[in-house]
Amino acid sequence: MNTDKVWFITGSNSGFGRSLTEAVLKKGYKVVATTRHPEEIEDLVKEYPDKVKAVSLDITEASEITSAIDTALQTFGRVDVLINNAGFGTLGAVEEISDEQVRKQFEVNCFGTLNLTKAMLPHFRQRKAGHILNVSSVGGFTAFPGTGIYCATKFAIEGYSEALAKEIAPLEIKLTLVEPGAFRTEFAGDSLATPDEQINDYEETAHKFVKMQEEMSGEQPGDPDKAAQAMIKVVESDNPPMRLVLGEDALKATRQKIETFQKELDEWEDVTLSTSYEDAKTTSLG
């Protein structure tokens, strides 16, 4: 096994990021561990002084992105794997969430991830190598009541990632979307954002789902350490998937969405096909 790869991991101080950083270091890889709170990973720096470089990074700041990548290249000479993990959740009915909260959610989860990816691509293109893992969510494939704004950011990540994967494939650069279900991270804990005011009409939909997530915090079925091993397996694979669904709950929700969508496609096929010009030639969007 080649353990010479250099991993660049965002949000490495907690949740998936912390688990993955620890697992990657234990396997002998080198890591550029980025976080807004580098003091929280000092223990890893002491344990692996030659393998890990802790870097302060707020992915919403362009200058910090540039500086972090420069530091990575100066320290280890290259980056082989980019893990876009940093992010947080905003839960509540779509109508309840303020414009400020919506914009902050997109700034971090979507634009921050996108800008870091774009900044890393010149290095990957130059080397004709690299693997990007965008940590999305099962909520990037199917949405639930109370998750509309959070899921909107993840749907956005999925959209640009699908297109980007096709653009960079000829350049020998890989991209994988990671879609976890409920895992024991800080998602439903201190990092969770909620509306300042609630609307009673959403009590049985959005509020019910959000309350369920909050009550589940600390008891989610997913193990972040096992998720880390799954992500390492993907990076070490010669033929990694475009999407990696993690967790039984995520797999079930994904299959339900596919089944429902397929049923609607079949039921409305006649209407779908009724909108073309009679003399139109058959085309493909793929």
Q: What is the role of each PLM region?
A:
Residues 57-67, 99-100:
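The beta1-alpha1 cofactor-binding region of Rossmann-like NAD(H)/NADP(H)-dependent oxidoreductases
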Residues 13-14, 37:
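Conserved glycine-rich cofactor-binding loop
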Residues 170-241:
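SDR active-site lid
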Residues 117, 153:
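Active-site helix of classical SDR
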Residues 93-94, 101-103:
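Substrate-binding pocket helix/loop in short-chain dehydrogenase/reductase
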Residues 50, 71-84, 90:
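A glycine-rich helix->loop->beta "capping" turn
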Residues 137:
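Residue(s) in the substrate-gating loop at a strand-loop-helix junction
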